[in-house]
Amino acid sequence: MMGACVFAYPNMIVEHYTAERGLSNNIVNCTLKGKDGFVWFGTWYGLCSFDGTKFRSYDNRDGFYSADIPPRKIQRIVEDKNGFLWIKTIDRKLYLFDKRHESFHAVYDDVKEYSENIQIIKIQTTEDGDVLLLTKDKSLLRAHTDKDGKITMKQLHDSRPNVNVYDMRLKHNVF
């Protein structure tokens, strides 16, 4: 005796958004639904938000201005516990976006004291809302922002002594 189940799904509406409908670029590398209810898109041309009705681009082409140049070619976006967006680009740079003030901060100076090679390979949030950063030289950092966006970093692992400087591979398996 065999049993079979059939499930019916209600009619679903799927919307397609393109550059013609307000998205900054048709190439979307990543998305994030923020705590604020906005959907954030990492596109080839930069950061874009969607509030459910309209898009907003955060780049210099649309009259947006930030002290630091807005990132382009975004590969990954994560949100920390204070609502700041951490943005990793394809060229392995890292930015912090303050949604309240609509401004970017290049995180170069914050990372360089912990790593000789400040290229960021991976970003990920922790369960408590901090952000883990893995650099190209395999250093692991834990980053935290306060309510005003001030960044504090702690080095969890320094692989520099274990990295072959000629090909950036680990000499020993330290992870």
Predicted regions span which residues?
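Carboxylate-rich, polar loop motifs that coordinate divalent cations or form catalytic acidic clusters
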Residues: 1-175
